[in-house]
Amino acid sequence: MTINFDTATQTLEAEGLRCPEPVMMVRKTIRKMEDGETLLIKADDPSTTRDIPSFCRFMDHELIAEDTDSLPYRYLIRKGLSK
């Protein structure tokens, strides 16, 4: 199954930022989104390969897809239901 990263509701450009900035920006952006909307994150910090999946698990968001084979890394997240 091919994931189309271009269908994201919003995009967050986090290239050039280093830990913990990318995840902080993801959190801030997702807080403003509606449940079910999708966020494409583009980043080049190697720590995002660990931090973004962990953030999704911890905050109950769905990591739909990730592409970490080349830079920039891309992550597609669906915002979980607000509690």
UniProtKB/Swiss-Prot annotation:
Keywords: Cytoplasm. One of its GO terms (molecular function) is sulfur carrier activity. InterPro entries: Sulphur_carrier_TusA, TusA-like, TusA-like_sf. PROSITE patterns: UPF0033. SUPFAM superfamilies: SirA-like (SSF64307). It comes from the Bacteria. One of its GO terms (biological process) is tRNA wobble position uridine thiolation. GO terms for cellular component: cytoplasm. It is found in: Cytoplasm. The active site is at C19 (cysteine persulfide intermediate). Belongs to the sulfur carrier protein TusA family. NCBIfam families: PRK00299.1. HAMAP family: Thiourid_synth_A (MF_00413). Sulfur carrier protein which probably makes part of a sulfur-relay system. PANTHER family: SULFUR CARRIER PROTEIN TUSA, SULFUR CARRIER PROTEIN YEDF-RELATED. This is Sulfur carrier protein TusA. It comes from Aliivibrio fischeri (strain ATCC 700601 / ES114). The lineage of its organism: Bacteria, Pseudomonadati, Pseudomonadota, Gammaproteobacteria, Vibrionales.
